[in-house]
Amino acid sequence: MAADTKQINVNGTAFTYAEQGQGVPVVLVHGSLGDYRTWSGEMDDFAARYHVVAYSLRNHYPDTWTGGPYSYQGHIADLVALLHALNLGPVHLVGHSYGGTIAVMVAKDHSELIRSLVLAEPGVASWVANVEEAKPPLAELFKVAKVVQEHTQKGELDEAVISFMDLINEAGGGFKGLPVAFQTGMLQNSTTLKASFASPPPPTFTCDDASKIGTPTLVVEGELTLKVRRLIDNELARCMPHVERVLIPRAAHPLEMVNPKDFNAAVLQFLAKQ
């Protein structure tokens, strides 16, 4: 059965979400340039065993960012409110990239809502800012980010999206290496890339914070991902007390989009043990 697409008003905003399946709830949180459709390759597989909800973050498709607040703090508060509004907790919470950062922050402060945690390359570069090995790749990352930001400042949003994806999916063929449906979706969310450069930094998250998260956690990483992503995952695995790790073959950062078969199998195997 195909997913139903619905809307719910939370925190003064109408959130669009896809819902499918029955059983223990699994909530999917997409990353930068994504929306609920990012998880199209996961919905059927996950819904065969679980009640799956994939939602679009505030200002993401079918909405757009036209100015105003856009922040980790706001998205974290939205997710907590959404879980309460849909009466879903405790849930298996799956977050990718920006969404992984949101997920781990919710787990830190609202453990009562979380049954287990799946973090697919959660990304806050500041987590490894003091790791010596990370300094060269971080410098390269910031150099490219500056180019992306310059595109957004000139209103060249498509170019910004392409440059951004050429970086984070470099080993996977860049923007053009993505399935066409995801290319289209990212371009439709291009205003959120401009919003992200105007947003405040994420809340502080330290190794000590991570060590207090008792939730069973799976850290998922693409075989072809950037070195800095791997170093972030290493730090999480070092600090969090109940962590498993899995490597998704033939995938860089957008792992659930380019290799859903192996991604889904790894996540479902982990969830079955919880």
Annotate the PLM regions:
Residues 175, 179-238, 244-247:
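Conserved serine/cysteine hydrolase catalytic core
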Residues 57-59, 122, 250:
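Active-site loop/turn elements of alpha/beta-hydrolase fold enzymes
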Residues 28-31, 97, 222:
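Glycine-rich His-Gly loop
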Residues 6-68, 82:
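Conserved HGGG/HGGXW glycine-rich cap/lid loop of the alpha/beta-hydrolase fold
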Residues 89-128:
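Conserved hydrolase catalytic core segment
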Residues 126-182, 197-199:
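Helix-rich cap/lid subdomain of alpha/beta-hydrolase
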Residues 74-91:
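Conserved acidic catalytic loop of the alpha/beta-hydrolase fold
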Residues 242-274:
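Catalytic active-site module of serine/aspartate enzymes centered on a nucleophile-bearing elbow/loop
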